[in-house]
Each structure stands twice: as C-alpha cells, then as structure tokens.
C-alpha cells in the first residue's frame, strides 16, 4: 500500500541515516501500478542540484564556454567546476535544510489540497498565505547566504536516475494528479543538466520572480508551453505580465498557482518551487552516488498541463527540455520572442519510459519512443479523453474560437487524433466562399445581332415598292370575318424536342440559323448549338395579321372545357384557366391576374421606373412634370432631333425629350378624360335600388313573396361566360385602336432659318411618311381588304388629304388643346410659323377643325370611326367596281358610330344631337380639303420655280389624283344636304 510520508527529521541526526532512509523510501516508491492503491501519490521532496561545469563525458567544455544565469538573490561565485572534500559538510547541512523545507511544504500541500477553488479563479489565495510561502523560501535563501553554499557534483553519472510515475487513474476521482516523471537512465553529455540555484540556465528562480510554469489550454500568448519535466528556455516573468499559463511568484505577487480551467474537484495543487530547485519536484538532497529523481507534476482533472521543469545533469550548454540520450539536441520548447512551439520527445530505455507532456514534432520523433498522454481538460464534442499509461496519444490543445462549435468547420469529420499531427484537434479552416458546386457553364450566351423589331402593326421591312400604293397594299389578307381557326403564328413556333427527332427540311448552316419568336424578336444561334431549331419566316415576309391575336368566341368557350393535357400545355404567355371553383370571387381572380409576378413598369420615355399612368402614358414622375411644362414652350434641338433620351441623359435635350413624350402618346387631354372616366365609374358602381313591392290589396290581405332560387354552379357560370365572351369579342373600335398608326417625326432642321420653301418642303416630306402609315393602316382595316385592289387605291388617292388634315386636327387637340398645329413632335406650328409657311388661312382652317374637337370633347373611339368614314367619303362619279361592297362597308361604320354615340350616358335626344354634330363635322372637312388640294396642286405644278420638294409617294398620288379632280370626276359623299 502506497502511503504518503513526510520526513521532518531532527537537525542533529546522522547523515548516513538520512541517506539510507532516502534510498529505502525511493525503493519503496518504485513499486509498479499493481501494488498501489487509489490513494494519492507518494510524495518526496527531491532537491537536485549540480555544478554547471559537471560534464562527465566532455570535460574539455568548461564553464568558460557556457553562460550561466545566476539567481538575483544568490550572487555566488560559480567559477569552481569541481567539489572539494570540505564541501561535504555543507552538502549535509543543505540536506538537513531540505528536510525542514519538505516538512513545511508537506503542510502546505495539505492546506492547498483541502482548499476549494472556483472554476474561473486565476489569482485566488489558498489556505496558505503568501507570507508563509515566502517565509520558507526566505529561510532557505538565508541559509545559503550564511554558509556559502556550493552545489555538489554528481559523481556517479552512470548510476540511473530512478523516478516514479503513479498510475494515471489515481486522479480519476477528483484528486490532484501528481505525475512522477521518469528521467533517462543514462545521462551523458547531451542530456540537460540538473541544475542547482547557482547554475540554472533554463529558469529564473529568484524570490522576486519565481516562475512556476503552468501551461494552460486557454491561453498561449507569448509564453512557451512547458512539459512536466523541464521549463524550457529562460523566461523572466515580471509581476506586470499576466498570463494564464505562467504566473510570477514573488513576495508581492505570490499566489497559489491554479489552472484557470481547473474544476473544484480537481484543482491544481502544485507546491511552490523552492529557490534551489525552482520546480515542483520535491526531492531529498541528491547523493553523489545515487540521484533518485522524482518530479511531482500536478494535472487537474485531465488537464494537459505541466507545472515544473527539471533539467537533467550535464551539458548546461544545451538549453533544452529533458530528452533521451538520443534526442537531447532539441531546442527549447518556446521562446517569448518567437512564440514558436517546438516540442521534443524522450526515448524509452530499459523499460523505463521518459514521460513528457509534449506533442512530438516531425523533426524529433524517433523510432522506439512512445508517449504517454496526460488527461485533458477541454471537452471536444462532450467527450473527455482520459490519458492512460498504455496509450500512445499525446493530448495537446490549440484553443479554438470562443464559439466552440468547430466540429462542422474542421477538415476532419471526427475527433481522431493524428499521431503525426502536432495538434490533437484539427485546426479550423474556413471554407471557400467562392466554391461552386454546380457544373461549369458551357458555351457563350447567344447574342442577338438583330435589333428588336418594332412591335407595332406597321413595318417598313416589306419587299414591296415603298412608293407604290399597289405595292404597299399587296394581295388581300383575310378580312375581319375570316376564320381564325388556324395557328396565330403562320411561321410556326420554335420547337426543341429533347430526342432530336425533328430536323428542318432545308439544310442550312447552324451559323445562319435565325429564329423569330411570337413577339417578333430574332435570335441568332451560334455554331455548334445543340438541340434542333425550327425555322421561322423572315421578318421581311411577315404580313400584318392583327386579327390572329383575337381568338374566336367558340375557341374561347372550348378552352374552358377540362382537358387531360391542359396542365402540360403552354398558352403563349396567357394563362388558361382549367376550371372556375365555386367559391372563387371576382376579387380573388383579379388578385391572381395582377399578382406579384408581373414585371415592374418602366417609363416609356426615359426607361426609369414608372410611377403611374400620366397623361395617358405609363411614365415616371420626372417625365410627367416635364411634359406638363414643356408643352407650353417651343424647344429647339441643338443636334439633329435624334438625341438619346434615357434615365441619365433625359435632361440634356428638352426638345428631343418632348418629342419622345409626344411619340409615346402623352397628351394633356388624357387627364381630363381620366377624370371623366372616374366620375362615370362612380355612377356605374352605385347599386340599383330594388323595385318597390307590388301594392298590397286591402281586400285580400295576403302578402306575395317572390320565389327565390339559389343559383347553381351552372347557372352562375353562364352569365360569367357570357360577360367574358362579350368582353373578349373584338369590336371594331377595339381593332381600330390597336391599328392606329404611330406618330411620325418630320425631321425638321431648326438650325436653318424658317422660310416658306423650307417649311413646305418639310411638310411634304412629313406627308409622304404619313401616307405610308395611312396605306398600311388601310390595308389592315376591317372590311377594306374585301374591296378590289383598284377600288382600294382609288379611295386612298381621293381621301389622302382629308385623312392627313383630320389626323392633324386630332393631334393638335390631344397635345396642345388646339392651340397650335401639331404636325409632328418636332414640328409644331404657332402663329409665326403659320405666317411663314405661306398658308396661314389654311392653317387657321385646320385649327378650326381642331377647336371643334375641343368643343365636342371628341373621344378616340369616335375619332377612329370618323376617320374610316372619311376614307370612304370620296368616290369617282362613275362609281367603284365593287360598289355594293363599298356601300355595305360604309353603312357598317356609320352604324358603329351611332352605337358609339348612344353609349354615352346622355338621353336618346342628346345622343342623336351628338351624332348630328359629328356627321356635320365630317361634311365640313370636304370644304377644307378642297382648299388644301388646290394649294397642293399649285405648289406641285410650280415646284421647280418655288423650290418645294415632293417625296415620291406624294408624286405618285398627286399625279393620279390631279387630272381626276380637275376634270370633276371626284364625288364627295355628304351626310347632310347643303
């Protein structure tokens, strides 16, 4: 049974008796782990001292080659490298003093062991005050000063240093683990020396700065990590330096050293090192013949920690940790300057392993060396690994980040310690934030080499003659009443099956393949593009077929029927409802149709984010305010009226910005009509009052209650389908609104002075551009293509001036409220320009028509139908080839105008009166057109002399119309007799 003995022998006992007791004690302590119990480790105070010059195997290396670090309190002369016979008495007296110190330190250990330490305590005072701790040290120092102590030389170097290591399991129950460290059996020239207070190169041990090194896993700082055997290189810890792993013990700053992470049950209870040994190694005085070394290292509760440092004898030149004879050339553990942790290993010889609390480094790890781990204190993944003597793993810690949750961020998936790694826990490494898990992108994005085609109904990409009416009109297309059962995309929709079973009929190189989607946008596929591509027709061959965008009613009704494959179909961008649930209200359907998936609105003028619909166009607030103020000014462009207007450059040119606003369709009258629409909606939303109940007969005295029938699902769907059918059925007014020509720019050059010739030439060029738009508009007019081509050309030739002047009056009414003549966004006539154009009276006549629009508050639906009637208002006297078709078409549009007038909330009398005023306005256009044609014919004849230019389109029309009008072959159609 292992016991704990404290030797306090009287001072006058014989020295030989003490040496024999020491030998017996050490022999009794050398029992194996099987002969020990779970009691605390046997404690003996071992004081090992040596002369720095004692190097048995290399005596030529004297003290002159060494730098000795002297204790500040012991300024002794260390020049002597040998031991005199007269020093034996001094050695015996020092042994007696060591026994006294051992007794006092044993009492100190009992007090410290019973003390309770908190977990986070760093500088807590133990049961023994610092004064008492220092008192023993002071007595020892005094004794050395009085007696002129000299350390003895270890004469028997070949004798093994017997040390003892208790079973590490003895500290499992919370007791303080005192690891008895074994030193190498044979110490030769490369082994670190066991130094006396005079020659201790690896520690500074004055009472003012005693370094009781305690490595802690919580802080590495700038202090080295110490093994349980040696303290490493010299390190002076001043009182001002605070380190969780190293404390300064002086009379002022003396404290019981405890690990900052130690638990209350397993506190670090290491004795304070005495000045001669400066370690927690408690040993009797070393014998020249037999130096049994026994270091007591305290490790609290699996704390991988070292408290003391003991240098083995010989070779004081080598500042290294305790090493095996084969690995003694390793440098120090750490330096406060470099902060580099270099670990050494100790080899095992003759069955006595040298135990070090160090991680083997790849440079010093040798074959045959095995390491015994000390228990660790940190919990990794809530698993405590208790070191056992048989295990070969070294438990060293690198303090992780405060979060502690580094299991998922470490490279390893487990906590297995790699023997070849200097760290037991894998070092945390941040994952790359730029790593990509997907496959790399293959191929370059296709670039569209073709500009986005205009989405309007009119395109200038026809292969026909631009300056020929017959060329523009071309072959007839299906009329308004034609069937729309066919596909809405004559060129076919691009299909790309995955199996590659479809191939185009013609063999075309992949680099020349062009696809056109339903919106008219072209796509150019690069060479080597995978997948099959169906060829669409060329944009030049596309003929305008607006009617294909309006589905027939029967097709719409059929789409409501449930189909098995309806969910897998695509509806060309329009959602197709499979069924209508019973409990779905109109507000729910409205919220679904106007969901968050709709793209954000963009200003049609500058491209900025739109704030709403202003003056009839979706624009931003900036363009709204600009248009409101700009219509009152006459801006001039410093360039060629083609400035870029976008979000950044919209303020550069107000003329081009106003021109773009007008081109987008902004007008001041839209605000008034919007207010009228709101008032109209309020009248319509007023609930109708239920009819009063029938008067009750007093004779009968009975009350009749009308039978109420709850609507079923079918009866509720029928009116909904009927209303949807009526709403989606394209009316002529809806079609006319969709095919309305866009505003054309005149290309007016304001840098030149305004003259009659330049203004008239500009008006003629503008009229030529507008005529192209008029011909294209008439080509898609419902019912107009049913007429023979010759009749179509004749009607356009007779009515072109009437259509141009009527459209001018509408633009002036919408954009300037009939204050100016709005020929184009870049050409607006005020009074001055009217005089300069040499046609002031004609301009005033056209302005009067525009003022009539203001008086009647003409709507766009009325205007569009009236314009069609003006196209059909002049015919040859001999009549047309298909007069019947012409009469039918004209009658249909007159009826449509009548319906449009009756839609107003006015009474029937007021609607007829409005119809009369509108038709009267149409009749007044003939008188104005006659005057305009007369002036036009005159300038056409005298164009050479007047230097007035006429475009090719007008030359063709006027050349055919002039002889017919002058011969009286033109017959205007009036609604009212003069």
UniProtKB/Swiss-Prot annotation:
Residues 259-300 have a biased composition (Low complexity). Aldosterone binds at residues 764, 770, 811, 939. GO terms for molecular function: DNA-binding transcription factor activity; sequence-specific DNA binding; steroid binding; zinc ion binding. Residues 603-666 bind DNA. InterPro entries: NHR-like_dom_sf (IPR035500), Nucl_hrmn_rcpt_lig-bd (IPR000536), Nuclear_hormone_rcpt_NR3 (IPR050200), Znf_hrmn_rcpt (IPR001628), Znf_NHR/GATA (IPR013088). The modification Phosphoserine is found at residues 250, 259, 283, 287, 299. Residues 776-779 are annotated as: Important for coactivator binding. Zn(2+) 2 binds at residues 637, 643, 653, 656. Progesterone binds at residues 764, 770, 811, 939. It comes from the Eukaryota. The keyword Iron-sulfur does not apply. Expressed in heart and kidney. It is found in: Cytoplasm; Nucleus; Endoplasmic reticulum membrane. It holds the Pfam family zf-C4. Residues 720-958 form the NR LBD domain. Zn(2+) 1 binds at residues 603, 606, 620, 623. Residues 1-602 are annotated as: Modulating. Residues 234-243, 301-331 have a biased composition (Polar residues). Residues 667-719 are annotated as: Hinge. Residues 688-697 have a biased composition (Pro residues). Composed of three domains: a modulating N-terminal domain, a DNA-binding domain and a C-terminal ligand-binding domain. Receptor for both mineralocorticoids (MC) such as aldosterone and glucocorticoids (GC) such as corticosterone or cortisol. Binds to mineralocorticoid response elements (MRE) and transactivates target genes. The effect of MC is to increase ion and water transport and thus raise extracellular fluid volume and blood pressure and lower potassium levels. Heteromultimeric cytoplasmic complex with HSP90, HSP70, and FKBP4, in the absence of ligand. After ligand binding, it translocates to the nucleus and binds to DNA as a homodimer and as a heterodimer with NR3C1. Binds the coactivator NCOA2. May interact with HSD11B2 in the absence of ligand. Binds the coactivators NCOA1, TIF1 and NRIP1. This is Mineralocorticoid receptor.
């Amino acid at each position: 049974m292992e016991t704990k003995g404290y030797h306090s022998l009287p001072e006058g006992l014989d020295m030989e008796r003490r040496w024999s007791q020491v030998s017996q004690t050490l022999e009794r302590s050398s029992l194996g782990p099987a002969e020990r119990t779970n009691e605390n480790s046997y404690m003996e105070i071992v004081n090992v001292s040596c002369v720095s010059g004692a190097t048995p195997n290399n005596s030529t290396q004297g003290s002159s080659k060494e730098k000795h670090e002297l204790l500040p309190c012991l300024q002794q002369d260390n020049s002597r490298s040998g031991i005199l016979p007269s020093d034996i008495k001094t050695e015996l007296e020092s042994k007696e003093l060591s026994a006294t110190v051992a007794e006092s330190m044993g009492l100190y250990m009992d007090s410290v062991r019973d003390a309770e330490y908190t977990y986070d305590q760093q500088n807590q005072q133990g049961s023994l005050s610092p004064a008492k701790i220092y008192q023993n040290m002071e007595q020892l120092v005094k004794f050395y000063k009085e007696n002129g102590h000299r350390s003895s030389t270890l004469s028997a170097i070949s004798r093994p240093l017997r040390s003892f290591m208790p079973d590490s399991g003895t500290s499992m129950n919370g007791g303080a683990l005192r690891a008895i460290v074994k030193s190498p059996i044979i110490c030769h020239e490369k082994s670190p020396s066991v130094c006396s207070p005079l020659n201790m190169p690896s520690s500074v041990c004055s009472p003012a700065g005693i370094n009781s090194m305690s490595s802690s896993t919580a802080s590495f700082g700038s202090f080295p990590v110490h093994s349980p055997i040696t303290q490493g290189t010299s390190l002076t810890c001043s009182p001002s330096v605070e380190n969780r792993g190293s404390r300064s013990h002086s009379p002022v700053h003396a404290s019981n050293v405890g690990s900052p992470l130690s638990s209350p049950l397993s506190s670090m209870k290491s004795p304070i090192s005495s000045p001669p040994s400066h370690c927690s190694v408690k040993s009797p005085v070393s014998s020249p013949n037999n130096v049994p070394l026994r270091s007591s290292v305290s490790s609290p509760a699996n704390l991988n920690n070292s408290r003391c440092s003991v240098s083995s004898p010989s070779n004081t030149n080598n500042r290294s940790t305790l090493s095996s004879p084969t690995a003694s050339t390793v440098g120090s553990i750490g330096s406060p300057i470099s902060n580099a942790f270099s670990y050494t290993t100790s080899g095992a010889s003759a069955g006595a392993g040298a135990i070090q609390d160090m991680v083997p480094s790849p440079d010093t790890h040798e074959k045959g060396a095995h390491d015994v781990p000390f228990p660790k204190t940190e919990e990794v993944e809530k698993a405590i690994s208790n070191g056992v003597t048989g295990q070969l793993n070294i438990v060293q810690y690198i303090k992780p980040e405060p979060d502690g949750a580094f299991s998922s961020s470490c490279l390893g998936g487990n906590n297995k310690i790699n023997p070849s790694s200097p760290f037991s826990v894998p070092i945390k490494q941040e994952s790359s934030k730029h790593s990509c898990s997907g496959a790399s992108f293959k191929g370059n994005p296709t670039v569209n080499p073709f500009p986005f085609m205009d989405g309007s109904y009119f395109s200038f990409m026809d292969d026909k003659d631009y300056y020929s009416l017959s060329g523009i009109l071309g072959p007839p297309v299906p009329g308004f009443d034609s069937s729309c059962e066919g596909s809405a995309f004559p060129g076919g929709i691009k299909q790309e099956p995955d199996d590659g079973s479809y191939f185009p009929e013609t063999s075309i190189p992949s680099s020349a393949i062009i696809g056109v989607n339903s919106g008219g946008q072209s796509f150019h596929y690069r060479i080597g593009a995978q997948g099959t591509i169906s060829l669409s027709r060329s944009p030049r061959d596309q003929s305008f077929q607006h009617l294909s965008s309006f589905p027939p009613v029967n097709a719409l009704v059929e789409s409501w029927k449930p189909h098995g494959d309806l969910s897998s179909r695509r509806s060309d961008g329009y959602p197709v409802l499979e069924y209508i649930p019973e409990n779905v209200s109109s507000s729910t359907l409205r919220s679904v149709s106007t969901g968050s998936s709709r793209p954000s609105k963009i200003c049609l003028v500058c491209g900025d984010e739109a704030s709403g619909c202003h003056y009839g166009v979706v624009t931003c607030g900036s363009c709204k305010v600009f248009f409101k103020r700009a219509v009152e000014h006459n801006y001039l462009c410093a360039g060629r009226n083609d400035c870029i207007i976008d979000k950044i450059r919209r303020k550069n040119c107000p003329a081009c910005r106003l021109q773009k606003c007008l081109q987008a369709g902004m007008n001041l009258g839209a605000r008034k009509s919007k207010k009228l629409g709101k008032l109209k909606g309020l009248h319509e939303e007023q609930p109708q009052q239920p009819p009063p109940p029938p008067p009750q007969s007093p004779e009968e005295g009975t009350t009749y209650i009308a039978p109420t029938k709850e609507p079923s699902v079918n009866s509720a769907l029928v009116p909904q389908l009927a209303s949807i059918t009526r709403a989606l059925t394209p009316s002529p007014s809806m079609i006319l609104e969709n095919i309305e020509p866009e505003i054309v720019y005149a290309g007016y050059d304001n840098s030149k002075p305004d003259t009659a010739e330049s203004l008239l030439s500009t008006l003629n060029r503008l009229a030529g551009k507008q005529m192209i738009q008029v011909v294209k508009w008439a080509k898609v007019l419902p019912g107009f293509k049913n007429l023979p081509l010759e009749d179509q050309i004749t009607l356009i030739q007779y009515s072109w001036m009437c259509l141009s002047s009527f459209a001018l009056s509408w633009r002036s009414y919408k954009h300037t409220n009939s204050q100016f003549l709005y020929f184009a966004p870049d050409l607006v006539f005020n009074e001055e320009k009217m005089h300069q154009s040499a046609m002031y009276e004609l301009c005033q006549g056209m302005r009067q028509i525009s003022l009539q629009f203001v008086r009647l508050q003409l709507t766009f639906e009325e205007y569009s139908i009236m314009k069609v009637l003006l196209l059909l208002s002049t015919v040859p006297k001999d009549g047309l080839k298909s007069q019947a078709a012409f009469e039918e078409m004209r009658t249909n549009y007159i009826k449509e105008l009548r319906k449009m007038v009756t839609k107003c909330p006015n009474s029937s009398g007021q609607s007829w009166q409005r119809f009369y005023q509108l038709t009267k306005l149409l009749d007044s256009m003939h008188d104005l057109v006659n005057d305009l044609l007369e002036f036009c014919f005159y300038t056409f004849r005298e164009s050479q002399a007047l230097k007035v230019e006429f475009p090719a389109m007008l030359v063709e029309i006027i050349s055919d119309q002039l002889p017919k009008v002058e011969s009286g072959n033109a017959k205007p159609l009036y609604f009212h007799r003069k």
